[in-house]
Amino acid sequence: GVIPCGESCVFIPCISTLLGCSCKNKVCYRN
């Protein structure tokens, strides 16, 4: 929840969910 994964999730979901990232406030975060 704190580390930005450098990916947005405004129109498409996070591809980086495979790396443990999740969508928050239209940006993908890890932890």
Curated annotation (Swiss-Prot):
Q: Which family does it belong to?
A: Belongs to the cyclotide family. Bracelet subfamily.
Crosslink position(s): Cyclopeptide (Gly-Asn): G1-N31
Query: Cystine bridges: which residues?
Result: C5-C21, C9-C23, C14-C28
Keyword Disulfide bond in annotation: yes
- How does the record comment on the protein's domains? The presence of a 'disulfide through disulfide knot' structurally defines this protein as a knottin.
**What domain of life does the native source organism fall in?**
Eukaryota
What's the name of the protein? Circulin-B
Write the record's keywords in alphabetical order, separated by commas.
Answer: Antibiotic, Antimicrobial, Disulfide bond, Knottin, Plant defense
What is this protein's function?
A: Probably participates in a plant defense mechanism. Has antibiotic activity. Inhibits the cytopathic effects and replication of the human immunodeficiency virus. Active against both Gram-positive and Gram-negative bacteria.
Q: Which Pfam families match?
A: Cyclotide
Disulfide bond as UniProt keyword: yes
Q: What InterPro entries does its record include? A: Cyclotide, Cyclotide_bracelet_CS, Cyclotide_sf
Q: How is it modified after translation?
A: This is a cyclic peptide.
The GO annotation for biological process reads:
defense response to bacterium
